[in-house]
A protein has these predicted regions:
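Active-site SXXK
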Residues: 83, 97-115, 172, 211-215, ...
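A small/polar active-site loop signature that marks catalytic segments
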Residues: 205-338
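Soluble periplasmic/extracytoplasmic beta-strand elements of cell-envelope proteins
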Residues: 74-78, 86-88, 105, 137-141, ...
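Bacterial Sec-dependent N-terminal signal peptides
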Residues: 1-26, 46
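Active-site-adjacent helix/loop patches that line small-molecule binding or acyl-intermediate pockets
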Residues: 43, 47, 121-127, 133-216, ...
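C-terminal soluble interaction/assembly domains
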Residues: 302-418
Length: 418
């Protein structure tokens, strides 16, 4: 009876599962009706199949939908408790991940940097302070902290008051040597709303020194100094440092799919190698070693950036699943990764999706959307209590809602009681 009641629920609720903030075209409406009819019949067909065969049968029928005449999908579902794959379809096909690339970046970052890592911005100077006058050079040293904000800048300004400085004579430099001079990622579209890849930002903008000088003057400090860019000397004295934790960065990076935060994380990975300046190539090398560690060949994939904006990223559902498995089996990574993932029906980019009782609060996964691509990768718990990880990449979908609907139905089947 329990299985029968669930299947009745599945039949009547699946067509409305995905909450989409996109205008519905006439083609979408007709496809929705056709999909709903197919779902109803395949749910009835799955009535008496045991887990996981019933889900496999359900997925097989979903894959017969008309949308796959003009689009592709790769998916893999892995039972973490049984340590075995339960669903595979085109799982090794190379596809653009869109923002599920952020999951790869996040796992690599926690693995390489550790859960206590902090993003740091420093204020340093050379010279001397006499009679309330600082004569020398000031260095604002960027560590690519995307959360550096007005409060942090005020702390920089207040540090001079604490030193008794009311006049600055010399130079005020931006030290941006933490990373290379590339301000855009490889393979980014010129007409996208791309973040600026500068290691010294304020409010996400590359106007740090201008804002700093303005705040100094507003606080009554006389600034008689030229501005420019230069590396901080080794003998410079650091007045104050501002920090943000890796968890703070992960939270916005994954829940809100923030591209700037993801690229900052990508360059922290690169910086951890000790190479200066940090480059995308260095980050790729670190992630490549992690891919080897999970038993796959990094040369099979193309990793261009940390956010998934690039047209040059090519990964597979298998790669994403194996990295999610690695994170789960390494407690420190999982401890920091899981709370940062969007939660179905509750927050982030999944707030308005999968609100039914079995998936809401259960599915924790990263979404991905770029033109023609819709993806979802993360974790959920099946009705039998087993933890699952999964990756679904829809490619060639001209209406993202169709990909999201497919992904939601897969997750509902995984989470619902049999």
């Amino acid at each position: 009876m329990k299985r029968y009641l669930w299947l009745l629920f599945l039949v009547f609720t699946l067509p409305a599962a995905a909450q989409i903030e996109e205008e519905t075209t006439e083609d979408d409406k007709s496809e929705s009706i056709a999909d709903s009819t197919a779902i109803d019949s395949l749910a009835r067909d799955s009535l008496f199949l045991p887990w996981p065969q019933s889900v496999q049968h359900y997925v097989d029928r979903l894959l017969q939908a008309d949308m796959f005449e003009t689009s592709q999908v790769g998916l893999m579902v892995y039972d973490l408790d049984a340590d075995s794959a339960i669903i595979r379809f085109n799982e090794r096909q190379l596809m653009r991940p869109a923002s599920t690339m952020k999951v790869i970046t996040a796992i690599a970052a926690i693995d390489k940097l550790g859960g206590s890592y902090q993003f740091k911005t420093e204020l340093c100077y050379t010279g001397r302070v006499e009679n309330n006058v600082l004569t020398g050079d000031i260095y604002c040293v960027g560590g690519f902290d995307p959360r550096f904000n007005s409060d942090d800048l005020k702390a920089f300004v207040e540090s001079f008051h604490k030193m008794g400085v009311d006049t600055i004579r010399g130079n005020i430099y931006a030290d941006k040597t933490m990373k290379d001079n590339d301000t855009l990622g490889e393979g980014w579209c010129w007409d996208d709303d791309n973040p600026v890849l500068s290691p010294l930002l304020i409010g996400r903008k590359d106007v740090f020194i201008e804002r700093f000088v303005s705040e100094l003057r507003a606080a009554g400090v006389v600034v008689e100094a030229a501005t420019g860019e230069a590396r901080k000397p080794q003998d410079a004295f650091c007045i104050v440092s501002r920090f943000h934790t890796i968890d703070q960065i992960l939270m916005r990076m994954l829940k809100e799919s923030d591209n700037l935060y993801a690229e900052s994380m990508f360059y922290q990975i690169a910086s951890s190698t000790g190479n200066r300046p940090a480059t995308a190539e260095s980050a790729r090398a670190v992630i490549g070693r992690l891919i080897s560690k999970v038993g796959l060949n990094p040369s099979r994939y193309r990793l261009a950036d940390g956010s998934g904006l690039s047209l040059y990223n090519y990964v597979s559902p298998e790669l994403e699943v194996m990295l999610l498995r690695y994170a789960y089996r390494n407690g420190n990574i999982y401890l920091h990764l899981l709370p940062a993932l969007p939660v179905a029906g509750f927050d982030g980019t999944l707030k308005n999706r999968m609100r039914n009782p079995f998936t809401s609060g259960n599915v924790k996964a990263k979404t991905g959307t770029v033109m023609g691509v819709s993806s979802l990768a993360g974790y959920c718990t099946a009705a039998n209590g087993h933890r699952l990880c999964f990756s679904i990449i829809n490619q060639g979908v001209m209406h993202g809602r169709n990909g999201r609907r497919f992904q939601d139905r897969i997750c509902e089947a995984l989470c619902s009681p049999q």
